[in-house]
Regions:
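Conserved pre-ATP/AMP-binding loop-to-beta segment of ANL
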Residues: 27, 151-170, 177, 200-206
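AMP-binding/adenylate-forming catalytic core of the ANL superfamily
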Residues: 97, 114, 387, 392-393, ...
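Conserved AMP-binding A3 loop
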Residues: 38-42, 166-192
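Conserved AMP-binding/adenylate-forming
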Residues: 293, 297-424, 431-434, 449
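Conserved AMP-binding/adenylation subdomain of ANL enzymes
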Residues: 189-206, 213-299, 308, 333
Length: 553
Protein backbone atom coordinates (compact mmCIF):
# COMPACT_ATOMS: atom_id res chain seq x y z
CA UNK A 1 0.00 0.00 0.00
CA UNK A 2 1.34 3.40 -0.97
CA UNK A 3 1.88 6.10 1.61
CA UNK A 4 -0.81 8.80 1.68
CA UNK A 5 0.06 11.77 -0.51
CA UNK A 6 -2.17 14.58 -1.65
CA UNK A 7 -3.92 13.56 -4.84
CA UNK A 8 -6.04 16.05 -6.74
CA UNK A 9 -9.48 14.73 -7.62
CA UNK A 10 -12.30 16.77 -9.14
CA UNK A 11 -14.98 14.09 -9.48
CA UNK A 12 -16.21 11.32 -7.21
CA UNK A 13 -15.43 8.85 -10.00
CA UNK A 14 -11.75 9.80 -9.71
CA UNK A 15 -11.99 9.62 -5.92
CA UNK A 16 -13.50 6.12 -6.19
CA UNK A 17 -10.79 4.93 -8.58
CA UNK A 18 -8.03 6.46 -6.46
CA UNK A 19 -9.15 5.03 -3.12
CA UNK A 20 -9.95 1.54 -4.35
CA UNK A 21 -6.67 1.33 -6.31
CA UNK A 22 -4.25 2.69 -3.72
CA UNK A 23 -5.73 0.98 -0.64
CA UNK A 24 -6.96 -2.28 -2.24
CA UNK A 25 -6.21 -4.63 0.68
CA UNK A 26 -7.03 -2.15 3.44
CA UNK A 27 -10.34 -2.40 5.31
CA UNK A 28 -12.71 0.40 4.28
CA UNK A 29 -15.97 -0.33 6.12
CA UNK A 30 -17.17 -2.78 8.74
CA UNK A 31 -19.49 -3.18 11.69
CA UNK A 32 -17.94 -2.14 14.99
CA UNK A 33 -17.72 -5.69 16.33
CA UNK A 34 -17.13 -7.85 13.23
CA UNK A 35 -15.64 -7.68 9.73
CA UNK A 36 -18.53 -9.74 8.42
CA UNK A 37 -20.70 -7.53 6.23
CA UNK A 38 -17.86 -5.07 5.69
CA UNK A 39 -15.47 -4.48 2.80
CA UNK A 40 -11.83 -3.99 1.99
CA UNK A 41 -11.29 -1.25 -0.59
CA UNK A 42 -10.76 -3.99 -3.18
CA UNK A 43 -13.88 -6.00 -2.36
CA UNK A 44 -15.80 -2.74 -2.08
CA UNK A 45 -14.96 -1.88 -5.70
CA UNK A 46 -16.00 -5.35 -6.85
CA UNK A 47 -19.36 -5.01 -5.09
CA UNK A 48 -20.03 -1.47 -6.34
CA UNK A 49 -19.16 -2.40 -9.92
CA UNK A 50 -21.42 -5.44 -9.67
CA UNK A 51 -24.40 -3.42 -8.38
CA UNK A 52 -23.78 -0.75 -11.02
CA UNK A 53 -23.98 -3.42 -13.73
CA UNK A 54 -27.27 -4.60 -12.23
CA UNK A 55 -28.64 -1.05 -12.46
CA UNK A 56 -27.46 -0.84 -16.06
CA UNK A 57 -29.24 -4.09 -16.91
CA UNK A 58 -32.46 -2.62 -15.56
CA UNK A 59 -32.11 0.41 -17.82
CA UNK A 60 -30.79 2.84 -15.20
CA UNK A 61 -28.17 5.07 -16.80
CA UNK A 62 -26.39 8.40 -16.50
CA UNK A 63 -28.60 11.21 -15.23
CA UNK A 64 -31.15 8.88 -13.64
CA UNK A 65 -32.02 9.53 -9.98
CA UNK A 66 -31.51 6.72 -7.48
CA UNK A 67 -32.74 7.13 -3.89
CA UNK A 68 -31.17 5.62 -0.76
CA UNK A 69 -33.39 5.28 2.32
CA UNK A 70 -31.57 3.55 5.13
CA UNK A 71 -29.79 3.87 8.43
CA UNK A 72 -25.98 4.09 8.28
CA UNK A 73 -24.33 0.79 7.36
CA UNK A 74 -21.49 -0.52 5.16
CA UNK A 75 -23.93 -1.19 2.31
CA UNK A 76 -25.01 2.47 2.27
CA UNK A 77 -21.58 3.33 0.84
CA UNK A 78 -21.92 0.52 -1.70
CA UNK A 79 -25.22 1.94 -2.93
CA UNK A 80 -23.77 5.45 -3.20
CA UNK A 81 -20.66 4.38 -5.09
CA UNK A 82 -22.66 2.15 -7.43
CA UNK A 83 -24.63 5.26 -8.41
CA UNK A 84 -22.48 8.38 -8.52
CA UNK A 85 -19.16 7.37 -10.21
CA UNK A 86 -21.16 6.08 -13.18
CA UNK A 87 -23.02 9.31 -13.93
CA UNK A 88 -26.18 8.57 -11.99
CA UNK A 89 -27.49 10.92 -9.31
CA UNK A 90 -27.89 9.86 -5.67
CA UNK A 91 -30.92 11.00 -3.67
CA UNK A 92 -30.12 10.28 0.01
CA UNK A 93 -33.09 10.29 2.39
CA UNK A 94 -32.65 10.71 6.15
CA UNK A 95 -33.52 7.47 7.99
CA UNK A 96 -35.97 9.13 10.40
CA UNK A 97 -38.04 10.62 7.57
CA UNK A 98 -41.78 9.94 7.68
CA UNK A 99 -43.67 8.04 4.99
CA UNK A 100 -45.06 11.32 3.68
CA UNK A 101 -41.62 12.95 3.55
CA UNK A 102 -40.17 9.96 1.68
CA UNK A 103 -43.01 10.08 -0.84
CA UNK A 104 -42.55 13.81 -1.41
CA UNK A 105 -38.79 13.47 -1.95
CA UNK A 106 -39.19 10.53 -4.34
CA UNK A 107 -41.80 12.44 -6.34
CA UNK A 108 -39.97 15.77 -6.42
CA UNK A 109 -36.63 14.21 -7.36
CA UNK A 110 -38.22 11.91 -9.96
CA UNK A 111 -36.25 8.95 -8.62
CA UNK A 112 -36.55 5.75 -10.64
CA UNK A 113 -34.81 3.40 -8.22
CA UNK A 114 -34.93 2.98 -4.45
CA UNK A 115 -32.40 1.24 -2.23
CA UNK A 116 -34.21 0.63 1.07
CA UNK A 117 -33.11 -1.13 4.25
CA UNK A 118 -35.31 -3.72 5.90
CA UNK A 119 -35.66 -1.44 8.92
CA UNK A 120 -37.12 1.37 6.80
CA UNK A 121 -39.16 -0.67 4.30
CA UNK A 122 -42.35 -0.15 6.31
CA UNK A 123 -42.28 3.59 5.53
CA UNK A 124 -42.53 3.11 1.76
CA UNK A 125 -45.98 4.09 0.52
CA UNK A 126 -47.86 2.15 -2.13
CA UNK A 127 -47.60 5.25 -4.32
CA UNK A 128 -43.80 5.01 -4.25
CA UNK A 129 -43.82 1.25 -4.85
CA UNK A 130 -46.02 1.72 -7.91
CA UNK A 131 -43.77 4.42 -9.36
CA UNK A 132 -40.43 2.66 -8.90
CA UNK A 133 -38.76 1.01 -11.86
CA UNK A 134 -36.63 -0.91 -9.39
CA UNK A 135 -36.52 -1.45 -5.62
CA UNK A 136 -33.52 -3.11 -3.98
CA UNK A 137 -33.13 -4.46 -0.44
CA UNK A 138 -30.05 -2.66 0.89
CA UNK A 139 -29.32 -5.37 3.46
CA UNK A 140 -29.04 -8.14 0.85
CA UNK A 141 -29.07 -6.34 -2.54
CA UNK A 142 -31.92 -8.57 -3.63
CA UNK A 143 -34.40 -7.05 -6.08
CA UNK A 144 -37.67 -6.38 -4.25
CA UNK A 145 -39.57 -5.11 -7.25
CA UNK A 146 -38.87 -4.46 -10.92
CA UNK A 147 -41.11 -3.09 -13.62
CA UNK A 148 -40.18 -4.68 -16.93
CA UNK A 149 -42.43 -2.31 -18.84
CA UNK A 150 -40.48 0.76 -17.70
CA UNK A 151 -37.21 -0.22 -19.39
CA UNK A 152 -36.59 -1.48 -22.87
CA UNK A 153 -32.79 -1.49 -23.10
CA UNK A 154 -29.67 -1.33 -20.97
CA UNK A 155 -28.93 2.00 -19.33
CA UNK A 156 -25.91 3.92 -20.55
CA UNK A 157 -23.42 5.05 -17.94
CA UNK A 158 -20.91 7.83 -18.47
CA UNK A 159 -17.76 9.21 -16.92
CA UNK A 160 -18.98 12.27 -15.00
CA UNK A 161 -17.43 15.70 -15.43
CA UNK A 162 -16.73 18.00 -12.46
CA UNK A 163 -19.83 20.06 -13.32
CA UNK A 164 -22.19 17.07 -13.44
CA UNK A 165 -24.68 16.56 -10.61
CA UNK A 166 -23.56 13.99 -8.04
CA UNK A 167 -26.37 14.19 -5.52
CA UNK A 168 -29.49 16.10 -4.52
CA UNK A 169 -29.82 16.34 -0.74
CA UNK A 170 -33.19 17.31 0.70
CA UNK A 171 -33.09 19.40 3.81
CA UNK A 172 -35.80 21.19 5.75
CA UNK A 173 -33.46 22.39 8.48
CA UNK A 174 -35.18 24.27 11.30
CA UNK A 175 -37.50 26.32 9.09
CA UNK A 176 -39.74 23.56 7.76
CA UNK A 177 -39.32 24.47 4.10
CA UNK A 178 -37.93 21.36 2.37
CA UNK A 179 -35.55 22.02 -0.50
CA UNK A 180 -33.37 19.88 -2.75
CA UNK A 181 -29.74 21.01 -2.62
CA UNK A 182 -27.98 20.17 -5.89
CA UNK A 183 -24.30 19.30 -5.39
CA UNK A 184 -21.90 18.62 -8.24
CA UNK A 185 -18.92 16.29 -8.38
CA UNK A 186 -16.64 19.32 -8.07
CA UNK A 187 -18.55 20.57 -5.01
CA UNK A 188 -18.02 17.36 -3.04
CA UNK A 189 -14.57 16.45 -4.39
CA UNK A 190 -13.22 19.91 -3.59
CA UNK A 191 -14.51 19.64 -0.04
CA UNK A 192 -12.71 16.31 0.37
CA UNK A 193 -9.46 18.08 -0.54
CA UNK A 194 -10.43 20.84 1.89
CA UNK A 195 -10.83 18.21 4.63
CA UNK A 196 -7.34 16.89 3.89
CA UNK A 197 -5.81 20.36 4.27
CA UNK A 198 -7.87 21.12 7.39
CA UNK A 199 -7.23 17.86 9.22
CA UNK A 200 -4.81 15.35 7.75
CA UNK A 201 -5.95 11.77 8.33
CA UNK A 202 -4.20 8.64 7.03
CA UNK A 203 -4.82 4.95 6.30
CA UNK A 204 -4.00 4.27 9.97
CA UNK A 205 -7.03 6.18 11.23
CA UNK A 206 -10.24 4.63 12.54
CA UNK A 207 -13.60 6.42 12.20
CA UNK A 208 -16.62 5.54 14.33
CA UNK A 209 -19.73 6.61 12.43
CA UNK A 210 -22.65 7.81 14.55
CA UNK A 211 -24.35 10.36 12.26
CA UNK A 212 -26.74 9.51 9.41
CA UNK A 213 -24.90 9.05 6.11
CA UNK A 214 -27.71 10.84 4.30
CA UNK A 215 -26.56 14.04 6.01
CA UNK A 216 -23.87 15.91 4.08
CA UNK A 217 -21.58 16.18 7.14
CA UNK A 218 -21.28 12.41 7.49
CA UNK A 219 -21.36 11.86 3.73
CA UNK A 220 -18.40 14.12 2.99
CA UNK A 221 -16.27 13.85 6.11
CA UNK A 222 -17.32 10.36 7.21
CA UNK A 223 -17.53 8.48 3.89
CA UNK A 224 -15.82 10.37 1.05
CA UNK A 225 -12.82 11.59 3.04
CA UNK A 226 -11.99 8.10 4.43
CA UNK A 227 -12.11 6.86 0.81
CA UNK A 228 -9.51 9.50 -0.02
CA UNK A 229 -7.15 8.84 2.88
CA UNK A 230 -7.63 5.06 3.18
CA UNK A 231 -9.10 5.07 6.68
CA UNK A 232 -11.47 2.45 8.11
CA UNK A 233 -15.03 3.40 9.06
CA UNK A 234 -16.90 1.41 11.73
CA UNK A 235 -20.69 1.35 11.97
CA UNK A 236 -23.26 0.67 14.68
CA UNK A 237 -26.19 -1.70 13.97
CA UNK A 238 -28.61 0.52 15.92
CA UNK A 239 -28.95 4.23 16.81
CA UNK A 240 -26.13 5.26 19.17
CA UNK A 241 -27.75 4.85 22.59
CA UNK A 242 -25.31 5.43 25.46
CA UNK A 243 -24.73 1.75 26.30
CA UNK A 244 -24.08 0.73 22.68
CA UNK A 245 -21.85 3.75 22.05
CA UNK A 246 -19.73 3.04 25.13
CA UNK A 247 -19.30 -0.58 24.06
CA UNK A 248 -18.32 0.42 20.52
CA UNK A 249 -15.82 3.00 21.77
CA UNK A 250 -14.03 0.36 23.84
CA UNK A 251 -13.83 -2.05 20.92
CA UNK A 252 -12.99 0.33 18.06
CA UNK A 253 -10.83 2.81 19.99
CA UNK A 254 -11.46 5.42 17.26
CA UNK A 255 -8.93 8.07 16.36
CA UNK A 256 -11.55 10.16 14.57
CA UNK A 257 -15.16 11.02 15.36
CA UNK A 258 -17.71 13.36 13.82
CA UNK A 259 -20.45 14.42 16.19
CA UNK A 260 -23.02 17.08 16.91
CA UNK A 261 -22.80 19.30 20.04
CA UNK A 262 -25.62 17.46 21.83
CA UNK A 263 -23.48 14.37 22.46
CA UNK A 264 -20.61 16.07 24.27
CA UNK A 265 -23.05 18.48 25.99
CA UNK A 266 -24.95 15.52 27.44
CA UNK A 267 -21.71 13.97 28.70
CA UNK A 268 -20.72 17.29 30.29
CA UNK A 269 -24.08 18.04 31.94
CA UNK A 270 -24.89 14.47 32.88
CA UNK A 271 -21.52 13.32 34.19
CA UNK A 272 -18.73 15.90 34.34
CA UNK A 273 -20.55 18.91 35.83
CA UNK A 274 -22.34 16.93 38.59
CA UNK A 275 -19.01 15.34 39.55
CA UNK A 276 -17.41 18.77 40.02
CA UNK A 277 -20.43 20.32 41.77
CA UNK A 278 -20.79 17.50 44.30
CA UNK A 279 -17.29 18.05 45.64
CA UNK A 280 -16.21 21.31 47.27
CA UNK A 281 -12.59 20.30 46.73
CA UNK A 282 -13.09 19.72 43.01
CA UNK A 283 -15.04 22.97 42.67
CA UNK A 284 -12.25 24.90 44.39
CA UNK A 285 -9.55 23.21 42.31
CA UNK A 286 -11.47 23.92 39.12
CA UNK A 287 -11.72 27.64 39.92
CA UNK A 288 -8.29 28.20 41.45
CA UNK A 289 -5.79 25.83 39.86
CA UNK A 290 -5.78 27.17 36.30
CA UNK A 291 -7.79 24.34 34.78
CA UNK A 292 -5.80 21.52 36.41
CA UNK A 293 -9.00 19.78 37.44
CA UNK A 294 -10.35 20.13 33.91
CA UNK A 295 -7.23 18.52 32.48
CA UNK A 296 -7.47 15.60 34.89
CA UNK A 297 -11.13 15.06 34.02
CA UNK A 298 -10.27 15.64 30.35
CA UNK A 299 -7.89 12.67 30.44
CA UNK A 300 -10.72 10.52 31.79
CA UNK A 301 -13.04 11.91 29.12
CA UNK A 302 -10.58 10.94 26.40
CA UNK A 303 -10.37 7.46 27.92
CA UNK A 304 -14.17 7.25 27.79
CA UNK A 305 -13.96 7.79 24.03
CA UNK A 306 -11.58 4.87 23.66
CA UNK A 307 -8.32 6.57 24.64
CA UNK A 308 -7.01 7.13 21.10
CA UNK A 309 -9.07 10.08 19.81
CA UNK A 310 -6.91 12.69 18.08
CA UNK A 311 -9.71 14.44 16.20
CA UNK A 312 -13.16 14.94 17.72
CA UNK A 313 -15.03 17.01 15.15
CA UNK A 314 -18.10 18.93 16.29
CA UNK A 315 -20.45 20.42 13.71
CA UNK A 316 -24.06 20.81 12.66
CA UNK A 317 -24.97 23.31 15.40
CA UNK A 318 -23.33 25.73 17.82
CA UNK A 319 -21.53 24.27 20.83
CA UNK A 320 -22.54 25.51 24.29
CA UNK A 321 -19.87 28.09 25.36
CA UNK A 322 -19.57 26.63 28.88
CA UNK A 323 -18.97 23.15 27.48
CA UNK A 324 -16.43 24.47 25.00
CA UNK A 325 -14.66 26.35 27.79
CA UNK A 326 -14.28 23.08 29.67
CA UNK A 327 -13.01 21.21 26.58
CA UNK A 328 -10.47 23.96 25.96
CA UNK A 329 -9.16 23.83 29.55
CA UNK A 330 -9.20 20.04 29.47
CA UNK A 331 -7.03 20.04 26.32
CA UNK A 332 -9.51 17.66 24.71
CA UNK A 333 -8.72 17.22 20.97
CA UNK A 334 -11.91 18.76 19.66
CA UNK A 335 -12.32 20.87 16.53
CA UNK A 336 -15.21 23.05 15.43
CA UNK A 337 -16.50 22.68 11.89
CA UNK A 338 -18.86 25.17 10.29
CA UNK A 339 -20.83 24.68 7.13
CA UNK A 340 -24.14 24.01 5.43
CA UNK A 341 -25.58 21.42 3.09
CA UNK A 342 -25.35 24.09 0.38
CA UNK A 343 -21.56 24.28 0.84
CA UNK A 344 -20.82 20.54 0.78
CA UNK A 345 -20.52 21.31 3.85
CA UNK A 346 -17.26 22.60 5.35
CA UNK A 347 -16.43 26.31 4.99
CA UNK A 348 -15.02 27.31 8.39
CA UNK A 349 -13.11 25.59 11.17
CA UNK A 350 -11.32 26.07 14.47
CA UNK A 351 -8.51 23.58 15.11
CA UNK A 352 -5.91 22.99 17.81
CA UNK A 353 -3.85 26.10 18.41
CA UNK A 354 -6.39 28.74 17.37
CA UNK A 355 -9.61 27.64 19.04
CA UNK A 356 -11.35 30.18 21.22
CA UNK A 357 -14.69 29.85 22.97
CA UNK A 358 -17.62 30.73 20.73
CA UNK A 359 -15.68 31.11 17.50
CA UNK A 360 -16.08 29.08 14.33
CA UNK A 361 -12.51 30.07 13.49
CA UNK A 362 -11.29 30.84 10.00
CA UNK A 363 -12.25 29.95 6.41
CA UNK A 364 -11.07 26.50 5.31
CA UNK A 365 -8.67 25.85 2.46
CA UNK A 366 -9.92 27.00 -0.96
CA UNK A 367 -12.97 28.82 0.47
CA UNK A 368 -13.50 32.56 0.98
CA UNK A 369 -15.66 33.95 3.78
CA UNK A 370 -16.57 37.55 4.54
CA UNK A 371 -19.30 39.59 6.22
CA UNK A 372 -21.93 41.11 3.95
CA UNK A 373 -23.98 44.24 4.63
CA UNK A 374 -22.14 45.02 7.88
CA UNK A 375 -23.82 47.20 10.51
CA UNK A 376 -21.28 49.99 11.21
CA UNK A 377 -22.39 50.29 14.84
CA UNK A 378 -22.39 46.63 15.88
CA UNK A 379 -20.00 45.14 13.32
CA UNK A 380 -22.58 42.47 12.60
CA UNK A 381 -23.02 41.14 9.09
CA UNK A 382 -24.17 38.06 7.24
CA UNK A 383 -21.51 35.44 6.49
CA UNK A 384 -21.21 34.90 2.75
CA UNK A 385 -19.07 32.26 1.07
CA UNK A 386 -17.42 31.64 -2.26
CA UNK A 387 -15.58 28.52 -3.44
CA UNK A 388 -15.76 25.38 -5.59
CA UNK A 389 -17.82 23.68 -2.88
CA UNK A 390 -20.84 26.01 -3.18
CA UNK A 391 -23.93 24.25 -4.58
CA UNK A 392 -25.28 24.55 -8.10
CA UNK A 393 -28.66 25.60 -6.69
CA UNK A 394 -31.97 24.28 -5.39
CA UNK A 395 -33.60 21.62 -7.55
CA UNK A 396 -36.49 22.99 -9.63
CA UNK A 397 -36.43 26.26 -7.67
CA UNK A 398 -34.57 29.04 -9.54
CA UNK A 399 -36.33 31.76 -7.54
CA UNK A 400 -35.07 30.43 -4.20
CA UNK A 401 -31.64 29.80 -5.72
CA UNK A 402 -31.39 33.43 -6.85
CA UNK A 403 -32.41 34.66 -3.39
CA UNK A 404 -29.44 33.01 -1.63
CA UNK A 405 -26.73 34.55 -3.81
CA UNK A 406 -25.54 38.14 -3.81
CA UNK A 407 -25.39 40.02 -7.11
CA UNK A 408 -21.64 39.33 -7.33
CA UNK A 409 -22.04 35.58 -6.73
CA UNK A 410 -21.43 35.04 -2.99
CA UNK A 411 -23.57 32.45 -1.23
CA UNK A 412 -25.60 33.87 1.66
CA UNK A 413 -25.47 31.59 4.71
CA UNK A 414 -28.14 33.49 6.69
CA UNK A 415 -25.79 33.38 9.71
CA UNK A 416 -25.16 36.75 11.35
CA UNK A 417 -21.66 37.11 12.78
CA UNK A 418 -18.89 39.46 13.84
CA UNK A 419 -15.12 39.19 13.39
CA UNK A 420 -12.41 39.87 15.95
CA UNK A 421 -9.09 41.61 15.33
CA UNK A 422 -7.53 38.28 14.27
CA UNK A 423 -10.18 37.66 11.64
CA UNK A 424 -11.99 34.89 13.50
CA UNK A 425 -15.75 34.64 13.01
CA UNK A 426 -18.29 34.54 15.87
CA UNK A 427 -21.87 33.67 15.00
CA UNK A 428 -24.52 35.72 16.79
CA UNK A 429 -27.50 33.83 15.38
CA UNK A 430 -29.53 32.94 12.31
CA UNK A 431 -31.05 35.72 10.27
CA UNK A 432 -34.26 33.72 10.12
CA UNK A 433 -34.34 33.38 13.93
CA UNK A 434 -33.60 37.03 14.72
CA UNK A 435 -36.28 38.88 16.67
CA UNK A 436 -36.72 42.63 16.28
CA UNK A 437 -36.88 44.35 19.68
CA UNK A 438 -39.34 47.12 20.64
CA UNK A 439 -36.81 49.82 19.81
CA UNK A 440 -35.44 48.12 16.70
CA UNK A 441 -32.78 46.06 18.50
CA UNK A 442 -31.58 42.82 16.90
CA UNK A 443 -32.29 40.06 19.41
CA UNK A 444 -30.64 36.70 18.76
CA UNK A 445 -32.49 33.98 20.68
CA UNK A 446 -29.43 31.71 20.54
CA UNK A 447 -27.54 34.09 22.85
CA UNK A 448 -30.34 34.00 25.43
CA UNK A 449 -30.58 30.22 25.12
CA UNK A 450 -26.87 29.86 25.90
CA UNK A 451 -27.57 31.44 29.30
CA UNK A 452 -30.72 29.41 29.97
CA UNK A 453 -29.07 26.12 29.03
CA UNK A 454 -26.52 26.53 31.80
CA UNK A 455 -29.13 26.80 34.55
CA UNK A 456 -29.32 23.67 36.68
CA UNK A 457 -31.82 21.17 35.32
CA UNK A 458 -32.12 22.69 31.85
CA UNK A 459 -31.43 20.26 29.04
CA UNK A 460 -32.40 22.39 26.07
CA UNK A 461 -34.35 25.55 25.35
CA UNK A 462 -35.59 27.86 22.65
CA UNK A 463 -36.76 31.45 22.93
CA UNK A 464 -39.73 32.52 20.83
CA UNK A 465 -41.65 35.77 20.42
CA UNK A 466 -45.34 35.75 21.29
CA UNK A 467 -47.47 38.89 21.36
CA UNK A 468 -44.38 41.08 21.57
CA UNK A 469 -42.94 39.14 24.55
CA UNK A 470 -40.02 36.72 24.76
CA UNK A 471 -41.04 33.28 26.01
CA UNK A 472 -38.54 30.56 26.90
CA UNK A 473 -39.56 26.97 26.19
CA UNK A 474 -37.45 24.70 28.38
CA UNK A 475 -36.90 20.94 28.31
CA UNK A 476 -35.52 19.58 31.62
CA UNK A 477 -32.62 17.17 31.79
CA UNK A 478 -33.38 13.49 32.23
CA UNK A 479 -34.58 12.61 35.75
CA UNK A 480 -34.63 16.26 36.89
CA UNK A 481 -38.42 16.20 37.04
CA UNK A 482 -40.19 13.16 38.51
CA UNK A 483 -43.36 13.53 36.46
CA UNK A 484 -45.16 10.50 37.88
CA UNK A 485 -43.71 10.31 41.38
CA UNK A 486 -44.89 13.61 42.88
CA UNK A 487 -48.35 14.97 43.58
CA UNK A 488 -49.64 17.54 41.15
CA UNK A 489 -49.41 20.38 43.71
CA UNK A 490 -45.81 19.52 44.63
CA UNK A 491 -44.87 19.17 40.98
CA UNK A 492 -46.29 22.58 40.08
CA UNK A 493 -44.60 24.16 43.10
CA UNK A 494 -41.23 22.70 42.10
CA UNK A 495 -41.69 23.84 38.52
CA UNK A 496 -42.70 27.37 39.58
CA UNK A 497 -39.58 27.70 41.75
CA UNK A 498 -37.41 26.37 38.94
CA UNK A 499 -38.93 28.74 36.39
CA UNK A 500 -38.38 31.69 38.74
CA UNK A 501 -34.74 30.68 39.07
CA UNK A 502 -34.36 30.47 35.28
CA UNK A 503 -35.90 33.92 34.83
CA UNK A 504 -33.75 35.48 37.54
CA UNK A 505 -30.45 34.07 36.25
CA UNK A 506 -31.27 34.75 32.61
CA UNK A 507 -32.49 38.31 32.94
CA UNK A 508 -29.47 39.25 35.07
CA UNK A 509 -27.21 38.09 32.23
CA UNK A 510 -28.85 39.51 29.10
CA UNK A 511 -29.57 43.00 27.79
CA UNK A 512 -32.72 44.93 28.58
CA UNK A 513 -34.14 44.21 25.12
CA UNK A 514 -33.52 40.47 25.59
CA UNK A 515 -35.41 40.11 28.88
CA UNK A 516 -37.50 36.93 29.02
CA UNK A 517 -41.10 37.45 30.17
CA UNK A 518 -42.03 33.88 31.00
CA UNK A 519 -40.85 30.28 31.01
CA UNK A 520 -42.83 27.25 29.88
CA UNK A 521 -41.76 23.67 30.55
CA UNK A 522 -41.87 21.08 27.77
CA UNK A 523 -43.45 17.74 28.61
CA UNK A 524 -41.82 16.07 25.61
CA UNK A 525 -38.39 16.40 23.96
CA UNK A 526 -38.08 18.96 21.19
CA UNK A 527 -38.44 17.66 17.65
CA UNK A 528 -35.04 17.85 15.96
CA UNK A 529 -33.22 17.68 12.64
CA UNK A 530 -30.64 15.00 11.77
CA UNK A 531 -27.92 17.09 13.40
CA UNK A 532 -30.04 17.53 16.53
CA UNK A 533 -31.01 21.15 15.94
CA UNK A 534 -34.47 21.99 17.26
CA UNK A 535 -37.11 22.51 14.56
CA UNK A 536 -38.05 26.00 15.78
CA UNK A 537 -40.93 26.50 13.37
CA UNK A 538 -42.85 23.74 15.17
CA UNK A 539 -43.01 25.81 18.38
CA UNK A 540 -43.46 29.35 17.13
CA UNK A 541 -47.14 29.60 18.08
CA UNK A 542 -47.74 26.73 20.50
CA UNK A 543 -45.98 23.84 22.23
CA UNK A 544 -46.87 20.79 24.37
CA UNK A 545 -45.94 22.39 27.69
CA UNK A 546 -47.01 21.86 31.29
CA UNK A 547 -48.60 25.31 31.20
CA UNK A 548 -50.76 24.45 28.17
CA UNK A 549 -51.81 21.20 29.82
CA UNK A 550 -52.72 23.09 32.99
CA UNK A 551 -54.96 25.48 31.01
CA UNK A 552 -56.89 22.58 29.54
CA UNK A 553 -57.72 21.06 32.94
Amino acid sequence: MQRMREKYVDTLAKLYDYGTTVYTKKQYTQWYDTKEGGYTFGSFKEKCDSISKKLTQYGIGAGDKVAIFSQSMPNWSVAFFSIVPFGRIAIPILPDSSENEVTNIINHSESKVLFVSQRNAGKISQEVKDKMTLMIDLDTFEVLKSDDEKFTCDGKTSVPTPEDIATIIYTSGTTGNAKGVVLSHRNLASNVITCYHSCKRTHKDRWLSILPMAHVLEMTLGMLYPMYCGATVYYLPKPPAASLLMKALKIVKPTTMLTVPMIIEKVYKGSILPTIQKSRTLTWMNKNMNGLMCRIIGMKLKATFGGHVTFYGIGGAKLDPEVEGFLLKAKFPYAIGYGLTETSPLIGYAMHGWRTVGSLGYPVYNVQLKLHDVNPETGEGEIVAKGPNVMLGYYKDPKRTKSVFTEDGWFRTSDIAVQDEKGRFYIKGRNSNMILGPSGENIYPEEIENVINNVEGVGESIVVERDGRLVALVAPTENFISWDKESEDKLYEKLDNWKSKILKITNKSVSKASQVSSVEVMKEPFEKTATQKIRRFKYKHSAPTVEEEKKEK
